[in-house]
Curated annotation (Swiss-Prot):
The keyword Iron-sulfur does not apply. Disulfide bonds: none annotated. InterPro entries: Int_cplx_su10 (IPR026164). GO terms for cellular component: INTAC complex; integrator complex. Keywords: Nucleus. Belongs to the Integrator subunit 10 family. One of its GO terms (biological process) is snRNA processing. The gene is INTS10. Its main location: nucleus. Component of the integrator complex, a multiprotein complex that terminates RNA polymerase II (Pol II) transcription in the promoter-proximal region of genes. Residues 366-393 are annotated as: Disordered. It comes from Gallus gallus (Chicken). This is Integrator complex subunit 10. It is found in: Nucleus. Pfam families: INT10.
Length: 710
């Protein structure tokens, strides 16, 4: 029998003995190896027996022998491939743990060599990168030789694969796994240009990861408490799987913390003017402002260095705080489909002073049939209100019930705003920041456009804000899945109400009215009369000039409809109380003053005073929409001798009736009787839901309302 035949016989005999007598099988193989030490099959069979019996130490020794003596055998590499896969695997099953333990028994030098050779066997870029990553983590000394090369390979693979989003498997491995190993190793020498390139890639990845919207999360699983979702760092614990990676590998804890750590390390390597210890965002921003004051005094190299410090430090403070603001005022952008529904908040001009400046006792009602001299005091006109609100510092009011952490959120808004202003303050900073934003395609970030729109409104640049809102509408159109759901109509509401508030601030009252009336189509009825809501929302006395206050309003029908009515009233009262007579505008004002009655009592008295001065008044929609008992009694009083016998044309076609007939005693008596009956019918309607009445007024009289402001 030949030597090969002998080996095969011995291996076969050992296999037959394994089920019944393991020790006998091992004895046969030990004998066989002593006779034929160069035969691979004998050693491999010995290894197989030890591996199947899960004897870690002996299996490890045999694997080591095979790796040294038979490095070209495919079976050895198949085995090594299984072991390295177990090292990369997140699983905790018994077999995987055994294979990891087996690898640990190998000498460090062999582990390193094995991983290097295993890497050479990989033709898949991702698998090869993960294998090299194993090597770099276990043997930090290899980072100098292989770290930068691996990083560049991953970035090159990202370009070759033409990844749509920076949040992809290649970028994740580079930013989260490879980059920290490179920049934290003092033996790896990197030019500043490469460090800035890597910082840029890391910032783009982390910001996109944290701000990924629900539309892009096709593999999003589960949801979280709304309180947790307020925190961008906590939000990262949602189950989100990056294509090509495992669930565990896709999770990133404290992404902002990681990003600012990279910023700090890069800053030290680039010899920035760094502060020792941890600094708040406010401190960082203050430091950058100081640096900007004397940045122009440096030579070109130092200027470039500190320019990069200011741009990257300020930019990261900006994006962090802008996201913090938007994720709190509109959390639905970043939550999963099963998350609790929280109404978004919208930044609007505060028009709660629409009723005038005179303090009103809200519990007081109009004295029935008061005498003209006593009851009709002149109220202060608000014609002189300055709606532009271009004060440098403006107060933003918000109810605690709508936003529990309002102090922190408004501080984030302030920091983001100041960061943006700093980045735009010098041409060199602005140019670099713009370049980065273009490369990141930030113009497609819906959440960022929401922040920028609010910031522009805050700055009082209303024409620019209108352009920004049109940009926002285009972005929302590109996020088509949301348009199918309620989110689409919600975004439309946000755009319409902010457009309305901007047009109002510009004095463009017809456009204001148009947007408000379009918005009324989205209002869900019924809404309870909100007369007492304002009592729960005391007006904050601000040190800023009149008309400069802003407020964060919930985007709900209950909150938005009262705001719309305020805007309409503000538009029409300017026309109603000018020297030129406009009964239609005055009639619209009277209808709108029913809302939150008696807050508008003084303005109503001003309207009555104007009617008395005119001696007559025509408004044929009166009985369609005026149901307030105090107003009805006042108008009934106007027709009496004591009230001044004011000529009122409040019935439809009443004017035509008088014009086309000879005014006889009988016809006049008939008109009086019609008026009395109409008043009686109207009194019976006083219990109607006023918000339903006013909503009907806005919908049915849209053409008339717009014509009045033309």
């Amino acid at each position: 029998m030949s030597a090969q035949g002998d080996c095969e016989f011995l291996v076969k005999r050992a296999r037959e003995l394994v089920p019944g007598d393991l020790w006998a099988a091992k004895a046969w193989l030990i004998t066989a190896r002593s006779l034929y030490p160069a035969d691979f099959n004998i050693q491999y069979e010995m290894y197989t027996i030890e591996r199947n019996a899960e004897r870690t130490a002996s299996a490890g020794r045999l694997l080591y022998d095979m790796f040294v003596n038979f490095p070209d055998q495919p079976a050895v590499w198949r085995e090594i491939s299984v072991i390295t896969a177990a090292l990369r695997n997140d699983s905790q099953d018994k077999q995987t743990q055994f294979l990891r333990g087996l690898f640990e028994t190998l000498p460090g030098r062999v582990q390193c060599e094995m991983l290097l050779k295993a890497t050479e066997q990989c033709f898949n870029t991702l698998e090869r990168a993960e294998m090299l990553l194993l090597l770099l983590r276990r043997f930090p000394e290899t980072v100098v030789q292989h770290g930068v090369g691996l990083g560049e390979t991953l970035l090159e693979a990202e370009n070759i694969e033409d990844q749509e989003s920076p949040v992809n498997c290649f970028r994740k491995l580079f930013v989260c796994d490879v980059l920290p190993l490179i920049i934290n190793n003092p033996d790896v020498r990197l030019p500043a240009s490469l460090l800035y390139k890597y910082l840029n890639k890391a910032a783009e990845f982390y910001i996109n990861y944290v701000t990924r919207s629900t539309q892009t999360e096709s593999q999003y699983q589960g949801s979280q408490d709304s309180s947790d979702l307020m925190s961008p760092s906590k939000r990262s614990s949602q189950k989100y799987i990056i294509d090509g990676l495992t669930e565990k590998s896709s999770q990133i804890t404290d992404p902002w913390e990681r990003l600012f750590k990279i910023l700090s390390v890069v800053g030290m390597r680039c010899e920035w003017q760094m502060d020792k210890g941890r600094r708040s965002f406010g401190d960082i921003l203050h430091r950058m402002k100081d640096l900007c004051r004397y940045i122009s005094n440096f030579d070109s190299d130092a200027h470039a260095k500190y320019k990069n410090q200011v741009v990257y430090s300020t930019m990261l403070v900006f994006f962090k705080n802008a996201f913090q603001y938007v994720s709190n005022i509109q959390p639905s952008l970043f939550q999963g489909p099963n998350a609790p529904n929280q109404a978004p908040l919208i930044l609007l001009e505060d028009v709660t002073n629409v009723y005038g400046d005179t303090d009103i006792d809200r519990n007081k009602h109009i004295h029935k049939k008061r005498k003209l001299a006593e009851g009709r005091e002149k109220t202060m006109s608000s014609d002189d209100e300055d709606p532009s609100g271009k004060a440098r510092s403006r107060h933003i009011a918000v109810n605690k019930a709508d936003l529990a952490n309002s102090i922190e959120v408004l501080e984030s808004f302030k920091l983001a705003r100041e960061s943006w202003e700093l980045l735009c303050s010098l041409e060199s900073l602005d140019k670099e920041f713009t370049r980065i934003c273009l490369s990141w395609k930030t113009e497609t970030w819906l959440w960022l456009r929401i922040f920028l729109t609010d910031m522009i409104i805050y700055q009082g640049q209303y024409k620019k804000a209108i352009s920004s809102l049109h940009h926002l509408a285009a972005l929302q159109g590109s996020h088509s899945p949301q348009q199918i759901t309620g989110q689409g109509s919600l975004e439309n509401q946000r755009a319409l109400i902010q457009l309305a508030t901007c047009h109002f601030a510009l004095g463009e009252y017809r456009q204001t009215c148009e947007k408000v009336l379009d918005l009324m189509c989205y209002i869900l009825l019924p809404i309870q009369e909100g007369g007492k809501v304002q009592e729960e929302q005391p007006k904050v006395k601000s040190k800023f000039r009149k008309g400069s206050d802003l407020k964060l309003w919930p985007c709900t029908s209950r909150a938005i409809m009262p705001y719309c009515l305020h805007l309409l009233l503000a538009c029409f009262k300017l026309r109603a109380f000018t020297d030129n007579r406009d009964d239609t505008a005055l009639g619209h004002v009277i209808v709108l003053l029913q809302h939150e009655w008696p807050r508008g009592e003084n303005l109503f008295l001003k309207a009555i005073n104007k009617i008395c001065q005119q001696g007559n008044f025509q408004y044929e929609n009166f009985f369609n929409y005026v149901t307030n008992i105090d107003m009805l009694e006042e108008f009934a009083y106007l027709r009496t001798q004591e009230g001044g016998k004011i000529h009122l044309e409040l019935l439809p076609n009443q004017g035509m009736l008088i014009k086309h007939h000879t005014v006889t005693r009988g016809i006049t008596k008939g008109v009086k009787e019609d008026f009395r009956l109409a008043m009686e019918r109207q009194v019976s309607r006083c219990g109607e839901n006023l918000m339903v009445v006013l909503h009907r007024f806005c919908i049915n009289e849209k053409i008339l309302l717009l014509q009045t402001l033309s």
